[in-house]
């Protein structure tokens, strides 16, 4: 790794402030790849721990090391960001429990912990920094995903960010050594690699990080999920864990197949990274995106690995309901074949748009359909998966309604999505934001509904958990009811609930 020979040693948190033992003292590395401008950064490093200069240097090290290590997996013609030549990084963008990518910058915020009031800086977590970088990387590779009106594509954008964070820390030898010692080689348990943004999660009173790649979540049609509450919901950050969990499962299964050694872990890491990048480059932007990407990964494994890991991929995707038994039976057919270079008429960048009516607005949206972004003309082989236009139209309308329900859409650029009145009311994404929309006031100290039970989607809101028989009775030690019910009554007991107070 190239370093700046004139720089001083800087303390670098490799993972997250919650794991301060996972650190290194290093010179500032040289960015060999896509350009970054980190505000408040020093020229030589060696800043005081906790200062904005140190935070900037620490973020620069994480970003640069991540880019340098992953560069070999990028399509060869990707040399710059999707919408800017120089990605600007703001270490202290303001006070908020947030961080986001907006096509020109990465912005990191700070806030007071809901647990103990301590000031939490999102920029100090390599997990958060490289997650946001992941959005920028995916946008550079697949800019056609940015405005696609499809819930699963949005959820995958979040998953990809988490996977970049995970794959990034697995580039460090000290991480690999420590995780193998901590887990005794058994990666099928909660660990500091699978847990993402642990300090941030603890500050929001969420155990095992904001999200955890080690999970058992399975695919459910997101239209059938509640929009709020605990567990899997129709919210892109929440739903992203389905794909992240499947990917982590595949990584661990390959690691186990190869022998559960340090060398096996490194080899498995590189195998799944290559599978991910190759597949993301080829996969069409379909409505049922998780299903399409799963098929693409299996086809890609056949092409680059001679089907060495296809049985693992199929088993995991079936277990997670991302692929059905029918999908598996048909996988020898052409619907998952890689199109040959001669059929480059299939390769195009999507700009197919329709108008949908939602929330008293007529809005122009970009459809998710059978689109491909041709990264390398005459070299990219796309995947021949096709979806029905009717599905694309219905998904566009459903997606816009989802955005309105989460207050993610507006007539000003303060929202995640902007209705451009000067351009036929075109719906345009402004930013990929870690807005934690699945957090509700029941779970946050200092909020009026704190420590009350979150009711399901058909009766959303908070009510006293356990529904005490009298107003003076102490509530039971349960936070989230798993069943749907019409209101609080004495029949709702702790046995109806599945999530104990943290």
Task: Label each PLM-derived region with a short phrase.
Residues 1-52:
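Non-catalytic architectural context of zinc metalloproteases
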Residues 52-126, 138-452, 479, 487-501:
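Zinc-dependent metallohydrolase catalytic domains
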Residues 132:
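Walker B catalytic acidic pair
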Residues 450-463:
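Long, compositionally biased low-complexity repeat segments characteristic
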């Amino acid at each position: 790794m190239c370093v700046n020979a004139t720089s001083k040693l800087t303390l670098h948190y490799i993972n997250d402030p919650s794991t301060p033992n996972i650190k290194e003292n290093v010179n500032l590395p040289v960015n060999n790849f896509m350009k970054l401008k980190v505000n408040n950064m020093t020229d030589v490093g060696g800043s005081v721990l906790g200062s904005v200069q140190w935070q900037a240097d620490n973020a620069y090290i994480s970003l640069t090391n991540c880019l340098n290590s992953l560069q070999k997996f990028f399509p060869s013609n990707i040399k710059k960001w999707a919408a800017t030549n120089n990605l600007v990084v703001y270490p202290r963008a303001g006070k908020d429990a947030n961080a986001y990518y907006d096509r020109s910058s990465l912005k990191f915020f700070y806030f007071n912990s809901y647990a103990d009031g301590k000031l939490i800086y999102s920029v100090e977590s390599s997990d958060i920094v490289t997650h946001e970088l992941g959005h920028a990387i995916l946008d550079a590779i697949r800019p056609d995903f940015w405005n696609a009106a499809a819930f699963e594509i949005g959820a995958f954008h979040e998953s990809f960010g988490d996977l970049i964070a995970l794959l990034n820390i697995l580039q460090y030898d000290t991480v690999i050594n420590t995780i193998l010692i901590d887990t005794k080689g058994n990666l099928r348990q909660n660990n500091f690699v699978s847990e993402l943004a642990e300090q941030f999660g603890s500050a929001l009173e969420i155990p095992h990080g904001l999200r955890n790649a080690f999970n058992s979540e399975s695919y459910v049609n997101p239209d059938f999920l509640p929009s709020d509450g605990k567990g899997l919901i129709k919210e892109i950050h929440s739903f992203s864990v389905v794909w992240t969990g499947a990917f982590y499962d595949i990584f661990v299964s390959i690691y186990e197949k190869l022998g559960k050694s340090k060398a096996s872990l490194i080899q498995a890491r590189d195998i799944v990274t290559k599978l991910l990048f190759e597949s993301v480059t080829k996969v069409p932007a379909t409505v049922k995106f998780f299903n399409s990407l799963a098929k693409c990964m299996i086809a890609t494994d056949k092409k680059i690995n001679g089907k060495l890991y296809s049985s693992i991929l199929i088993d995991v995707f079936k277990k997670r309901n991302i692929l059905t038994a029918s999908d598996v039976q048909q996988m020898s057919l052409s619907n998952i074949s890689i199109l040959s270079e001669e059929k480059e008429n299939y390769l195009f960048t999507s700009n197919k748009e329709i108008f949908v009516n939602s929330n008293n607005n007529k809005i122009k949206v970009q459809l998710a359909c059978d689109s491909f972004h041709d990264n390398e003309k005459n070299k990219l082989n796309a995947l021949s998966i096709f979806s029905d236009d009717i599905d694309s139209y219905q998904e566009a309308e459903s997606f816009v309604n989802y955005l309105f329900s989460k207050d993610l859409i507006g007539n000003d650029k303060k929202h995640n999505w902007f209705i451009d009145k000067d351009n036929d009311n075109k719906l345009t994404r402004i930013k990929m934001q870690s807005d934690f929309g699945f957090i509700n006031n029941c779970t946050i100290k200092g909020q009026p509904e704190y420590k009350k039970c979150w009711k399901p989607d058909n009766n959303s809101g908070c009510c006293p958990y356990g529904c005490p028989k009298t107003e003076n009775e102490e509530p039971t030690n349960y936070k989230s009811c798993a069943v749907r019910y019409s209101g609080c009554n004495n029949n709702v007991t702790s046995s109806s609930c599945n999530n104990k107070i943290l």
